[in-house]
Regions:
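PAPS-dependent sulfotransferase catalytic domain
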Residues: 1-91, 134-166
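Short acidic/His-enriched helical or mixed secondary-structure segments at domain edges of catalytic enzymes
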Residues: 121-139
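Phosphate-binding beta-loop-alpha motif at adenosine-nucleotide cofactor sites
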Residues: 84-110
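Residue-level signal for secondary-structure boundary sites
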Residues: 46-47, 99, 116
Length: 166
């Protein structure tokens, strides 16, 4: 299964396959003392992706200000502190797409596991498998401008620079 989402049981518990170590994807805040792979994405792209996730029913300005269940982009980074958190591999989303070979090498080393696949599945194959997680691609430059872009950059300038997005 390509999609990393886990469905909860009615009692909010999660059933994992027997004999496998769970890999849990979260958009939530940090839970210390567990190994983690933190994937950072350009916050401007993240804002637009979240806007699409919400079906454009919440304003971009509310997403920037954290007026939704995930909070502000910079608060999430603050919570995880991926550059200083122990036992954490920091990956850039954009690097995964542009240099998969290097990314797989880093993952293999961090997880102490061999590489079993060296290709990303296509968007189409993921959509065929579970289309609810594949949305229209919208470039942040097409959706985020003016006052909203200025506000986001003001709130997040330090992280945008630190991670090479400005």
């Amino acid at each position: 299964n390509y999609v990393g989402h886990i469905e909860q049981n009615e009692d909010r518990s999660i059933t994992f396959p027997s004999g496998q170590k769970p890999l849990i994807k979260t958009h939530g805040k940090n839970k210390p003392n567990s190994p983690a792979i933190y994937i950072i994405r350009d916050g401007r792209s993240t804002i637009v992706s979240l806007w699409e996730f919400y079906g454009r029913k919440i304003s971009i300005s509310d997403i920037i200000e954290g007026n939704h269940k995930f909070g502000k982009w910079n608060e999430h980074i603050n919570s995880w502190d991926p550059l200083n958190r122990q036992d954490t591999l920091l990956l850039k989303y954009e690097d995964i797409l542009s240099d998969l070979e290097t990314t797989l090498g880093e993952l293999s080393y961090f997880l102490n596991k061999g590489i079993v696949c060296d290709k990303l599945p296509s968007r189409e194959s993921i959509a065929d498998n579970d289309g609810r997680w594949v949305r229209k691609k919208t470039d942040w430059k097409d959706a985020l401008s003016g006052e909203n872009l200025d506000r986001f950059n003001t709130l997040n300038k330090a992280y945008l620079k630190q991670f090479g997005y400005l």
